[in-house]
Amino acid sequence: MGKLIKYISILLIVVLVLSACGKSSNKDEGVKDATKTEASKHKGGTLNVALTAPPSGVYSSLLNSTHADAVVEGYFNENLLTIDKKIRPKAYIASWKDIEPAKKIEFKIKKGIKWHDGNELKIDDWIYSIEVLANKDYEGAYYPSVENIQGAKDYHEGKADHISGLKKIDDYTMQVTFDKKQENYLTGFITGPLLSKKYLSDVPIKDLAKSDKIRKYPIGIGPYKVKKIVPGEAVQLVKFDDYWQGKPALDKINLKVIDQAQIIKAMEKGDIDVTNDATGAMAKDAKSSNAGLKVLSAPSLDYGLIGFVSHDYDKKANKTGKVRPKYEDKELRKAMLYAIDREKWIKAFFNGYASEINSFVPSMHWIAADPKELNDYKYDPEKAKKILDKLGYKDRDVDGFREDPKGNKFEINFKHYSGSNPTFEPRTAAIKDFWEKVGLKTNVKLVEFGKYNEDLANASKDMEVYFRSWAGGTDPDPSDLYHTDRPQNEMRTVLPKSDQYLDDALDFDKVGIDEKKRKDIYVKWQKYMNDELPGLPMFQGKSITIVNDKVRNLDIEIGTDQSLYNLTKEA
C-alpha cells in the first residue's frame, strides 16, 4: 500500500508540474545569468563544496569512473591539454608538434611539475597510462582511444611487452606513431589526467580500480591534494604548496555529498559555498532566496536521451550478439518520440536550463547539423497513434493498452537511475504518462546508480529502455557512443551505414585537415541517425553552478583561462 500511495503522489506531482508549465510567471524568466564571479586576491580559508551525487570511489577517469568520481578527481589532478572557447585543444602542461600530420606527433611536458608524493611528472607516466589502457587486464572502456597507436594491438594481445608506437626521446618528450591516419589523432588522444607510474606500478592492472591507492589515497598533480576520504560521503583536500603554477589561494577544500533537496538550505545556512552540477530547480530556489546566492550558467556539451538496448553483448569479448527484436522497428521508436511532449517536460523539470534536441551531437560543437535539416519530432500524439495503428499495435482486448502486431501483450520496461535528485521519479513518471496516453503500457523502475551502470555495461537482459545523459569533450567524434562494438555503445547499435559515416569522418585520406569535409560527413550521419532513431534525443542542457556572495575567481564558461588554484573565498 505504501508503494502505491507513493506512486500516486508522484503522478500527482507530474500532473501539477506539467499543467503549471503553461501558466508560469517566474519573475526571473528572461534574466540572463552571469558566467563568473568577481575577482579577488584574497588568500587562505576553506571552501565547502556540495557534491550532488555520491562518488563510487574510482578516482581515475582512465579507469572508467563515474561523473561524480571525475568531479572529485578534477580537484586534485589535471589534464595535460586544455581547450579554447571554440572547444579546440590548447597547450597547457603539454605541448605538441606534428612530425607527419595524423601519422606521427611529438609531445613535450613542462619540467618541474610534481606529483603529490613529491616525484616529478615524467613522460614515463604518460606512457604508463597509455599502456594501462592497452593492457589485456584493463577492464575499462577506453582501449579504443589508444588502439590506433602503432603496436597497441600486439601489446593488447600479449604479443609484445611494449607499445612500439610510443618512443621516449627524453624524460619530457615522446613521439607517437599511429597505425592509420585519423583526423582526430590529437583530440582523440589520451591527454590526462594521468596515472603515476612510480606510485602505481606495484599494483596489478586488473586490481587498479579497486586498490587503496586509487580509492583511499589517490594522488595527482593538481593544486590540492587529498587528505582524507570518507567513502561515498566526503573528501577533504589541502593546498599543495609545490603546485607548478604557485601556491593555491585556499588552504582547504571540503567536498560533501548533500541530498539535492537540501543543498539550497545548506547554502543558506552557510554550510556550503559552491554547488557544481546544480539543477534548474536548485537555480530557481537560489534566485528566490534572500541569502545572497548567485546562479552562474553557461552553454554546455551535455545532452540527454532515452536509449534502447538493441542487441545482446558479450562484455568480456567486446562483441555484439543477436538482435533484441522488441524495439527493432524504427517507426515504433518514432511513435514513442512523437508521443512525448518534450517542451513541456523540459519546462517542468529543468526550469529553463535545457532545450529540445533532435541530434546526438550537442549544438555547441562545430560539427552540429543545422536544426532545420533535421526532423524536429514535435509533440504529436495523434501522429504517434496513427503510426502505431499502421504498425499493428492495437488495443484488441479493450483494456486501454495496445498489444503488439501478433496480438501479444506489449509493455515498455523503462528504467532510470536513482539518486537524491527529487525530479528523477516524477520526470520518469511523466514519460510513462505520455506513452500510456497513446496506449503503450509502461512500467518504470529506478535503479541504484552503480547497478544501473553495470547493467548497461553488460547489456543485461532486463535492461530494455533507459535514460542517459552524456557530457561531450574536445573531440566531437561520437564514435565511442554509437559505433558497433565500442564498449560505451550502451544501446549496442549495429548500423553499418552509421559506422561507415563515422569511419569516413576520421579517415585522413578522405578529409585531411579540411574541417568542412569532415563536418559534411558528420551532418550526413546526424541526418541518418535523426531518421533511424536508435535512441530518442530529449534535451541539451546548461552548466549550472550556485555560489554564495563570498566566492571569487570562478568562471564556468568553456575555454576560460581561470584556474582552480586561483579560486578563493573572502572572509
Model-flagged regions — what are they?
Residues 326-433, 524:
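Append "and occasionally in soluble cytosolic enzymes with long acidic Gly/Pro-rich linkers
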